[in-house]
Amino acid sequence: MEVAARSAATQAPASSLTIRRVGVFLGAEVSGVDLSKPLDRETVDALSNAHAQHGVLVFPNQAISSEDLKRFGRYFGELSVHPFSTSSADSAELIVYDNKEGNPPAATDVWHTDETFREAPPMGTILCSKIVPEVGGNTAFASMTAVYEGLSDRWQRFLSGLEAVHDFKPFRSLFPTDRAGIEKMRKFEDKYPAVTHPVVTVHPVTGRKVLFVNPQFTLYIKGMAEDESRMILEMLYRKTLIHEYQYRHRWDANTVVFWDNRNVQHAALHDYYPQRRLMERVTVAGTRPIAAEPPADAKDLRRYLMPPLSEFRNRGTAQKRQLDL
């Protein structure tokens, strides 16, 4: 895989801003900026470009308020409200994660891209650590551009033009099973119906291709039998687990992490109970994912599933492809 050559540290246009890579495929640490204060346009533009190039930006030593966090998020777009997560009583845009009073956290995250059950998933997510456990509680990130580029040419061609259906399936367990709960869930289904996204998207800033399926919200690939779709998705999900494609962040208090939801997946490790972990989050609204290629038709699917006829001839057999297209 070709890796773009970048210097270990680059000076952004704002003279005091330094961006230092911390991972091969994603991740950079940003210094020389104080998020408790308003930022000028030059700094915002530099951070926006770094966000697209590195996928995950880490801002250490940022003792900021909730209002500071929201202001920082608004530099990059409108803040969205998560329909299922627990928001602050003071602001619907602010999500608070806190296992105070010894309450165990939920089970460890499934790898995912945030809120792909929306027609327009968020462009980015910003998380600020307030209280962190002494041990555990890391967050893992994976570059879905690196995952795509690591696939063989044949797999890349096959996936091109495919579409997958996404749904808010993990949140269905939040609804009670009584009549009132079922009615409430149906209202959410009307508001957030299953949506279709390209399996391979194009990042709107870098122009690089991205594998855009995830085990938390993706249901199936359109135009395939259930077992075929499941087999392909499970193979693609395993690619996310390749360590070289990942950046694993160990949290310190007062750290802000801003990741690109358009080409990065993440999973939080909930291995810190009974220690406390208090985090605040804002989410920056995005636009519909851009397809790398027009939707594929059935003939395209069959063509790439079968090996070329020359492979059979080279084996000295008259065997013919099942589908001669």
Q: What is each stretch, according to the model?
A:
Residues E2-A253, N261-L325:
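Non-heme Fe(II) oxygenase catalytic core, chiefly the N-lobe of the double-stranded beta-helix
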